[in-house]
Amino acid sequence: MRSVTSFNDSWVFSEASTRDAERSGRVSRSACRTNAVELPFNYFDERCYQRAFTYQRVLAWRPDFSQGSRSSSTRQWPMRSCISTAKRSSRIRDGYTPFEARLTDRLLEGDNLITVKIDGSENPEIPPFGAGIDYLTYAGIYRDVWLKVTDPVSIANIKIETRDVLSDHKAVSLRCDLSNPQGLSFSGTISALLKNAAGEVLAEVAGETTGQSLAFEMDGLRGLSLWDIDDPVLYVIEVELRTGQGFRLLRRAFRLPHGEFTTEGFRLNGRPLKIRGLNRHQSFPYVGLRMGRTAKGSAHADIMNAHRLHCNLVRTSHYPQSKWFLDHCDRIGLLVFARNPRLAAYRWGGMETGGNPERPPHRSSATGTTRLSYIWGVRINESQDSHDFYAETNRLARELDPTRQTGGVRYITDSEFLEDVYTMNDFILGNEELPGANRPGTALRPQQECTGLPRKVPYLITEFGGHMYPTKIYDQEQRQAEHVRRHLEVLNAAYARNPGISGAIGWCMFDYNTTRISAPATGSAITASWTCSASPKFAAYVYASQCDPSEEIVMKPVTFWARGDDDIGGVLPLIVLTNCDEIELKYGSLTKRVGPDRENFPHLPHPPVVIDHRHFTKDELGVWGMKWESAEFTGFIAGKPVADLRMAADPVPTTLQVEADSKTLRREGRDTVRLILRALDQAGNVLPFLNDAVDIEIHGPARLVGPARIVLQGGSGFLAGVHGRRRHASSRSRRRGSAAAKLDLVALADGAASA
């Protein structure tokens, strides 16, 4: 391989028609913006991006373009694009899977104008369109672009499979596919090294090739560690191709896990593991899908797993997601349920399911062959049955990777079961409120009621909650407490001593912009445990509190601590989401210590503490018109205090906090970091109903994403800046003063070789 370099920078953009761009020959820089459309936070017309746009960039001739090399532009998921140079063009009718546009023999000496024409309109022949969908498909080049210069014969792909991972002598199967578009005659050598994280060579194989793919076996491997959620050990396969025309080196990280869904639940490396996860959309305020590597990669994965939510699985909704996010999931020990892009017409039964082998499920499956998640979604989300089509998607997935189980997400009962795992969106909780409902509130239905099968099968809940009880971060306290209780009830049912359920994946992680067929008035779905501006709702702590205290001690009272927020008045019953043994509440001169509510939530690893009139009488906490006091909460483990929290009776704005997801940004390409603003009271708690405006300033060679003045929602706000050499962001509110965050640029160059 000669080089793979970032091709993200120096693009100019035009809202002019593609015909106008071709006529002018080049888009004027003074007339362009970085984004096709910058969306308001809410209340916007989704049709604003459903039209044609043009991106252009000059590629200067380089000597290595002519030395028998092949040049191509690799794009990760632009929405339905046509790429052209002065000589020819390439076309892709898919917004979700990566592709290469070959530039070999198209480049001229001198400056070459690369034109990318984006069609953001909804075409029913292109997934996911065809009927209604409940998310937005933002137009534009919203992920990374690479310029790849290779030898005429190069490595096209590495496919890695692991075998016998539970034995002392493990095995790795490797297939190396070659790219030789000119059909050149050659002979060469392919060698492969297996290395650990320290770079030590653990195994080596080699073979001769005259153009065909080569398969290798590395067996009898001793001393290799299994990848685990608590110990995510990664290994590297390094493949080198040497021919008379040169050589190419390709590296691919992989892991050695053993995950299996059984009728007795999910087992990871031979031990039972109850899945606790959330679905994740990858959109952001203002820019949709167009965020840099740090923001859409490590930041989201860390929230899911390591720092905030302590989930062990993420389900990608409803499309293939950023390579950077998936790579980081591997690094931090987060399981992934991979998805195909949803073709809405299949859900509503409005499209024939006959077979073009290059339809998107094929492309998505092929893209994921080296992504060692434990289950593939080979069924279009919540679609009707289609025997021939889904028999083919299952066959294809098993052919591409026989080591991985398949799953098919449905919401209909008694559905044809063609996959290895029956995956079900169970939204039964809340149906008791519908007219004519004749069953009481039910957290989850028994497996066989949903499958209609006479036997138990591997079974996983892939969605629950969500639209059944939409909740805003600034909703009244009792609604938020009910939101919390519903998540608790479903997780409690999933953890019940019923091994037939492998676990449950809630809907969803972040609020997101969606279409009007399912959106609330603002246009943003409020169905998540976090806001779209990355602020946790109370329900987020349902998941966080289930972690072991050795990972993090969690104590979150589900209250704004005010007498007048709840109906009738007061704060009881008061849920405290915690993994502590006991919670002590001090109110005035009174102190009460309460343990977990195992009566109502007997199966959770860490049931919540529920403080009610069994612990405080009406007179002890006072009634309307009596003095309202501040509260102090203390968490105890093994009789020792481990957490404390004070909630003020008279909260006032005191501090404006600025927190960055990362203190570093990458130099190469386009990177973005999220900054979260929070208005805090004198006790350090967020002021949930403060909606003041905050002014933002960015100092240095960086750019603010979104408006320079934001209004706090739920006591918090969101902004993001695209990187420069060094940046300093500050914010100011007239009532609360100012706060600042400083970010420095660092040179972190990794991942390019796998583009």
Swiss-Prot record:
GO BP, sorted A to Z: carbohydrate metabolic process
EC numbers, comma separated: 3.2.1.23
GO molecular function, one term: beta-galactosidase activity
Reaction equations catalysed: Hydrolysis of terminal non-reducing beta-D-galactose residues in beta-D-galactosides
SUPFAM superfamilies in the cross-refs: (Trans)glycosidases, beta-Galactosidase/glucuronidase domain, Galactose-binding domain-like
Keywords (A to Z) from UniProt: Glycosidase, Hydrolase
PANTHER family, per database record: BETA-GALACTOSIDASE, BETA-MANNOSIDASE
Family: Belongs to the glycosyl hydrolase 2 family.
Name by which UniProt lists this protein: Beta-galactosidase
Gene: lacZ
